[in-house]
């Protein structure tokens, strides 16, 4: 899938290495970039070659299943600029596979793994001046799969749109020490047999009420419990969770109600590499409150320590800082992503910034 020629030529011919952005002030907010990727296909067919087009609004039928019934998926991944000016993407194949799993659950037509990865590379290459300088942030990449064709009843869309846009970002959480979490015993994020295990667009707006209530009370984020028993922890609004006690690192299993995070998978492997016993199992609230350390993982948040957890009227403080495992794992992961150490895992996909 070759990129359309004129937009990429426009980008490569500019004399600017970087966009006009105050990189030191980046937060996790949208900064519109130059180009996006768009491809379409009919139900039962395959995606044809997509195009790099100017970033902007899209036209969509008011009868589309994405608008009426929430038939849509999204992914999130990042591109990094190294000190030797390489641009790298972290494990895009894993996002492609997760989108395919979600598409099967929502009866959608996904791009192939190769189409997905190539489209991500094209999008990054077209917007390479928006990849922040080393240590100043990352380019957050958001692939979307939308049921965009018109249909009135509840049914698979007759047409699908695969779209990728991006934005330079800084830290997701600005707190320097650790997160202060509220365990929500009122609302639930997912239930058995639902869509909690795929990155459906419908999973996220229902958590906003809980998140706003928590933030208004001074918390950083919300930790949800399982809907079946209300006794086991599941995940935050947009990231996975781990607890540490002794040499054992535990995280809830991805058995249908928890998103199988790419960062979660990577951190589990790194923790195992340095001698920790990693367990995927049900983790009760009682175990959470007795843990020595708690941290969360995700594309946006990377690896972030949890400083406190509040459940009802009980507040527990955890180990953070240089002595914390999360600090070591964060360093191990970001050193791979930024090219500080050799990528022996084969996780990174390099893009030549001189192409285009």
UniProtKB/Swiss-Prot annotation:
Q: Which family does it belong to?
A: Belongs to the class-IV pyridoxal-phosphate-dependent aminotransferase family.
CDD domains with a match to the protein in the record: BCAT_beta_family
Which reaction does this chain catalyze?
A: L-leucine + 2-oxoglutarate = 4-methyl-2-oxopentanoate + L-glutamate; L-isoleucine + 2-oxoglutarate = (S)-3-methyl-2-oxopentanoate + L-glutamate; L-valine + 2-oxoglutarate = 3-methyl-2-oxobutanoate + L-glutamate
Q: What does this protein do?
A: Converts 2-oxo acids to branched-chain amino acids. Acts on leucine, isoleucine and valine.
**Under what name is this protein listed?**
Branched-chain-amino-acid aminotransferase 6
BP-aspect Gene Ontology terms = glucosinolate biosynthetic process from homomethionine; isoleucine biosynthetic process; L-leucine biosynthetic process; L-methionine salvage; L-valine biosynthetic process
Keywords from the named record: Amino-acid biosynthesis, Aminotransferase, Branched-chain amino acid biosynthesis, Cytoplasm, Pyridoxal phosphate, Transferase
Q: Which residues carry this modification: N6-(pyridoxal phosphate)lysine?
A: 199
Q: Give yes or no: UniProt keyword Kinase.
A: no
An example Gene Ontology cellular component term from the record?
cytosol
Q: Which NCBIfam families match?
A: ilvE_II, PRK13357.1
Is-annotated flag, keyword Lipoprotein? no
Q: Where in the cell is it found?
A: Cytoplasm
Hey, which pathway is this one from?
Amino-acid biosynthesis; L-isoleucine biosynthesis; L-isoleucine from 2-oxobutanoate: step 4/4; Amino-acid biosynthesis; L-leucine biosynthesis; L-leucine from 3-methyl-2-oxobutanoate: step 4/4; Amino-acid biosynthesis; L-valine biosynthesis; L-valine from pyruvate: step 4/4
- The EC number of this protein is 2.6.1.42
Question: Which organism does this sequence originate in?
Answer: Arabidopsis thaliana
Q: Name the cofactor(s).
A: pyridoxal 5'-phosphate
Molecular function terms from GO: L-isoleucine-2-oxoglutarate transaminase activity; L-leucine-2-oxoglutarate transaminase activity; L-valine-2-oxoglutarate transaminase activity; methionine-oxo-acid transaminase activity
């Amino acid at each position: 899938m070759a990129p359309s020629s004129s937009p990429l030529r426009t980008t490569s011919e500019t004399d600017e290495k970087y966009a006009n952005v105050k990189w030191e002030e980046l937060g996790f907010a949208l900064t519109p970039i130059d180009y996006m990727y768009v491809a379409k296909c009919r139900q039962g067919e395959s995606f044809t070659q997509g195009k790099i087009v100017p970033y902007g609004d899209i036209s969509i039928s008011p009868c589309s299943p994405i608008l009426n019934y929430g038939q849509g998926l999204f992914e999130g991944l990042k591109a990094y600029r190294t000190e030797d000016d390489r641009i790298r993407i972290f494990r895009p194949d894993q996002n492609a596979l997760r989108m395919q799993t979600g598409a099967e659950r929502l009866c959608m037509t996904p791009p192939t793994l190769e189409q997905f990865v190539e489209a991500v590379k094209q999008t990054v290459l077209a917007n390479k001046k928006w990849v922040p300088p080393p240590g100043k942030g990352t380019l957050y990449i958001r692939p979307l799969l939308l049921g965009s064709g018109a249909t009135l009843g509840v049914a698979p869309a007759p047409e699908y749109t695969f779209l990728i846009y991006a934005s330079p970002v800084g830290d997701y959480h600005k707190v320097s020490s650790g997160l202060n979490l509220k365990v929500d015993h009122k609302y639930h994020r997912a239930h058995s047999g639902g869509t909690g295990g795929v990155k459906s667009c419908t999973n996220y707006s229902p958590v906003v009420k809980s998140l706003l209530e928590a933030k208004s009370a001074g918390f950083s984020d919300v930790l949800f419990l399982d809907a079946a028993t209300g006794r086991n922890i599941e995940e935050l609004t947009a990231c996975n969770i781990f607890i540490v006690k002794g040499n054992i690192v535990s995280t809830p299993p991805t058995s249908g109600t928890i998103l199988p995070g790419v960062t979660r998978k990577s951190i589990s492997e790194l923790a195992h590499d340095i001698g920790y016993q990693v367990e995927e199992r049900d983790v009760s609230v009682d175990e959470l409150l007795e843990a020595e350390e708690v941290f969360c993982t995700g594309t946006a948040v990377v690896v972030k320590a949890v400083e406190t957890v509040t459940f009802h009227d009980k507040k527990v403080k955890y180990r953070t800082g240089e002595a914390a495992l999360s600090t070591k794992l964060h360093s191990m992961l970001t050193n791979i992503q930024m090219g500080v150490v050799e990528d022996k895992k084969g996780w990174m996909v390099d893009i030549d910034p001189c192409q285009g």
